[in-house]
Amino acid sequence: MDTMQQIHDFMIAEFASERTSFTPDENLLSQGIIDSLGILRLVTFLEERFDITTTDEDLVPENFATLTMIRNFVEKKRGA
C-alpha cells in the first residue's frame, strides 16, 4: 500500500464519521475535519507507521492541510 493510501485510510478511520473518502487536495483544516489535537494524533501515526521524527517546527498547517501535503511531508522526512 502506498503512502497516500495509508494516510487516507488512517484519516477515514480516525476522523470521518460519515465519509468514505477525501480528495488529495481537500483542505482538512479549513473544513474542520482535523484540528490541533487531531494533528497530534496524525503525527503519532506518521512517526510510528513511517519511522519518521517530527520537530516542533514541523507542526505547521502547511504540512498537514491536505493529504497531498501530508504525503509530501512524510516523503521529505523519509528522505532526510
Question: What is the predicted role of each segment?
Answer:
Residues 1-20, 72-80:
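Thiotemplate assembly-line natural product biosynthesis machinery
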Residues 6, 27, 69:
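Residue-level recognition of oxygen-bearing side chains
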Residues 14-33, 52-60, 78:
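Phosphopantetheine carrier-protein modules
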Residues 40:
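Conserved catalytic core of two-component sensor histidine kinases
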Residues 58-69:
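AMP-binding/adenylate-forming catalytic domain of the ANL superfamily
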